[in-house]
């Protein structure tokens, strides 16, 4: 027998048709802070640290998907956009 165990199993974190939970905060760190600021209190784009006080989750999702003002749409899509909208809607 050989001494090398070269198994073909790779753990990708997802299996089958399951949707892995999206880390909304990580998406925000990757896609939002460059314009909205590290603490989301605004930079070249407005503050979104209290987005939930001004917008519903549905409104936030619409802005993420379609853009508003100087923000282009589609910076986050699908499950990422939905997770970020839900996360921001809790910020009040």
From Swiss-Prot:
User: Which Pfam family, any one, appears in the UniProt record?
Assistant: Cytochrome_CBB3
Region annotated Disordered sits at 1-20
Q: How does the protein associate with the membrane?
A: Peripheral membrane protein
Protein keywords: Cell membrane, Electron transport, Heme, Iron, Lipoprotein, Membrane, Metal-binding, Transport
Matching PROSITE patterns: CYTC
Q: Which GO terms describe its molecular function?
A: electron transfer activity; heme binding; iron ion binding
User: Where mainly found?
Assistant: membrane
The positions making up the signal sequence are none
Which stretches are tagged as biased composition: Polar residues? 1-13
Q: Which InterPro entries match?
A: Cyt_c-like_dom, Cyt_c-like_dom_sf, Cyt_c_BACSU-c550-type, Cytochrome_c550/c551-like
State the source organism's domain of life.
Bacteria
Q: Which residues bind heme c?
A: 32, 35-36
Localization of this protein: Cell membrane
PTM details? Is a lipoprotein in vivo.
A cellular-component GO term for this protein? plasma membrane
Cited function: Natural electron acceptor for a formate dehydrogenase.
Q: Which family does it belong to?
A: Belongs to the cytochrome c family.
- UniProt xrefs under PANTHER family: CYTOCHROME C-551, CYTOCHROME C-553-LIKE
What's the protein here called?
Cytochrome c-553
């Amino acid at each position: 027998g050989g001494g090398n165990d070269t198994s073909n199993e790779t753990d990708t974190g997802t299996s089958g048709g399951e949707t892995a939970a999206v880390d909304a905060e990580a998406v925000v760190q990757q896609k939002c802070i460059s314009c909205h600021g590290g603490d989301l209190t605004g930079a070249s784009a407005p503050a979104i640290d209290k987005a939930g006080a001004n917008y519903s989750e549905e409104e936030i999702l619409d802005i993420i998907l379609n853009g508003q003002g100087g923000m282009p749409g589609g910076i986050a899509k699908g499950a990422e956009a939905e997770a970020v909208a839900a996360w921001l809607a809790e910020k009040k």
